[in-house]
Amino acid sequence: MAITAAMVKELRERTAAGMMDCKNALVEAEGDMELAIENMRKNGQAKAAKKAGNIAAEGAILIKTTDGLAALVEVNCQTDFVAKDDNFLGFANEVADAALASKVTIAELQAQFEEKRITLVTKIGENINIRRVEYVEGANLASYSHGATIGVVVAGEGDAESLKHIAMHVAASKPEFLTPDDVPADVVANEKRIQIEMAMNEGKPQEIAEKMVTGRMKKFTGEVSLTGQAFIMEPKKTVGVILTEKGITVSNFVRLEVGEGIEKKEEDFAAEVEAQIAAAKA
């Protein structure tokens, strides 16, 4: 498989490794991006292999709530200029309101608003996409929005302020699972295999490597789970400890971030302005 400059660029952005290291890793992996990252981790070259996708596309995360139900919707556009446009935000809010009212699937939501989307694309001159919708149910819901780029909803039992703080933590720390026990077996097995190979590459015998990995795996499952993470407001305590101390529980959470995993075509500011002027004249 031919290794393109775009592939090398993506791997550099995801790992912060050097250009030649990235190119060589892609050649070795025959163009398989995830395998290249895995191999680079083993070789100690990756600096950010945990990065959750390349944040590129623009748009907004909308959160709408009613009694016992919250809807989170991601609507994308091509530039941050349009992401702040009243027409775009009006459309995004209408989509989110419809999601909350009917609890429809993403396919149903896209179909429902396709005609309006096409009209907006024609008016604004950029591609608009209704990308994701997630729902959270619970008697007590806390939400947090970081601008319009990150949206979090937490379901649980406890006082509103504490649940809000947990939502803020989720926004900042990006947990993937609720507790260490919720980390899927295949994820744990894959990470354990990588850690053992890394330890053996350091010259450790397999028996010693496996013992070393036990501690590393506990750290890994803690870092990717909400209750195992250090609480951002009291870093010496885990979220799990904070929950116990405050007598609150969390049953579920959803975190959405604009453009997660979408590759964005890069344009300089002048080109972006020219594109907007051209669209306005069309």
Curated annotation (Swiss-Prot):
PROSITE patterns: EF_TS_2 (PS01127). Its main location: cytoplasm. The keyword Cytoplasm applies. GO terms for molecular function: translation elongation factor activity. Residues 79-82 are annotated as: Involved in Mg(2+) ion dislocation from EF-Tu. Keywords: Cytoplasm, Elongation factor, Protein biosynthesis. It comes from the Bacteria. It is found in: Cytoplasm. CDD domains: UBA_EF-Ts. GO terms for cellular component: cytoplasm. NCBIfam families: tsf (TIGR00116). Associates with the EF-Tu.GDP complex and induces the exchange of GDP to GTP. It remains bound to the aminoacyl-tRNA.EF-Tu.GTP complex up to the GTP hydrolysis stage on the ribosome. Belongs to the EF-Ts family. This is Elongation factor Ts. It comes from Colwellia psychrerythraea (strain 34H / ATCC BAA-681) (Vibrio psychroerythus). The gene is tsf.
